[in-house]
Amino acid sequence: MSPECARAAGDAPLRSLEQANRTRFSFFSDVKGDHRLLLAAVETTVLALIFAVSLLGNVCALVLVARRRRRGTTACLVLNLFCADLLFISAIPLVLAVRWTEAWLLGPVACHLLFYLMTLSGSVTILTLAAVSLERMVCIVHLQRGVRGPGRRARAVLLTLIWGYSAVAALPLCVFFRVVPQRLPGADQEISICTLIWPTIAGEISWDVSFVTLNFLVPGLVIVISYSKILQITKASRKRLTVSLAYSESHQIRVSQQDFRLFRTLFLLMVSFFIMWSPIIITILLILIQNFKQDLVIWPSLFFWVVAFTFANSALNPILYNMTLCRNEWKKIFCCFWFPEKGAILTDTSVKRNDLSVISG
């Protein structure tokens, strides 16, 4: 073998290793340069505000739903939705720590768990929304036939399936996220980053496609079909009301209107989820494409703001829910605090109204 061939053969593994390092996305690790403190302060302010609003909103929504005397399947699923939001925002302190230190100094365990828990909570959220829409559609059909809804054991099984499937679906992220040294643009030396390293490109492609399909598109299709069916039932019920004004019929319509109000709220939650989670899904797919197109540049700062936008969904969910379904409860709380006598009157008059609520029945 000629010296030129031997030198080329020896340099090939180095070039391959250098290319592999260049394709590793650093996610939250980023060298910000001279304005590091200012940028980190802005990022901290934004995420801290999202964290505070989300924590307060979800905890208050949890208390309002949990204090109802009767909690059905829908209420349990809504509680599950708020729990998933709380799990999702638990990643914010870790994200802020990395944005301040730039390098990953939290250890391998946190690296394995951070993106795993974020993906797990997102999967639980969309599956819960799909389960609520499907359960409400089935409940309305069974209500018209005089059939009772699922019992406590069925609810426990449903929640176990949602969390179990989400945990298994996100498991590859827990396995393949690891801490590696890498030199980032603007850095004088290598720093530790938490990045995703798949054994094969084929495995990464198959997981990305299957996860987006099964945990994003299919639940969205279930929600759309369920809402379409409920709209058909609601329109048919209103037409029957114009023909017959019997008490039983009017009572059935009142329940349908409450269901329609609940579905309108859940529809808003679903729309906000898809709007605020679509950018992160697209960004993850672009990171996958980066393996094939080296000229495609995705900055870690852009990834951070996309994730921050996704975090904001956890703050928006309880706001939408409280504004549309819990306005009377919040009015009662404020009146009890500022006007005790008026609050007592509202408390007495709202008992029967709460008993008629489908979400608590």
Curated annotation (Swiss-Prot):
Topology Cytoplasmic: residue spans: 67-77, 134-156, 226-268, 317-361
Pfam families the record matches: 7tm_1 (PF00001)
Phosphoserine modifications at: S350, S357, S360
The entry's keywords: Cell membrane, Cell projection, Differentiation, Disulfide bond, Endosome, G-protein coupled receptor, Glycoprotein, Inflammatory response, Lipid-binding, Lysosome, Membrane, Phosphoprotein, Receptor, Transducer, Transmembrane, Transmembrane helix
Highest taxon of source: Eukaryota
Protein's membrane topology: Multi-pass membrane protein
TM annotation in the entry: 46-66, 78-98, 113-133, 157-177, 205-225, 269-289, 296-316
Tissue spec. comment: Highly expressed in lung and colon.
Ranges in the topological domain labelled Extracellular: 1-45, 99-112, 178-204, 290-295
Subcellular location as annotated: Cell membrane; Endosome membrane; Lysosome membrane; Cell projection, Cilium membrane
One annotated GO biological process: positive regulation of glucagon secretion
Subunit structure: Interacts (via C-terminus) with ARRB2 following LCFAs stimulation.
Role of this protein: G-protein-coupled receptor for long-chain fatty acids (LCFAs) with a major role in adipogenesis, energy metabolism and inflammation. Signals via G-protein and beta-arrestin pathways. LCFAs sensing initiates activation of phosphoinositidase C-linked G proteins GNAQ and GNA11 (G(q)/G(11)), inducing a variety of cellular responses via second messenger pathways such as intracellular calcium mobilization, modulation of cyclic adenosine monophosphate (cAMP) production, and mitogen-activated protein kinases (MAPKs).
Family note: Belongs to the G-protein coupled receptor 1 family.
The protein's name in its UniProt record: Free fatty acid receptor 4
Source species of the chain: Macaca fascicularis (Crab-eating macaque)
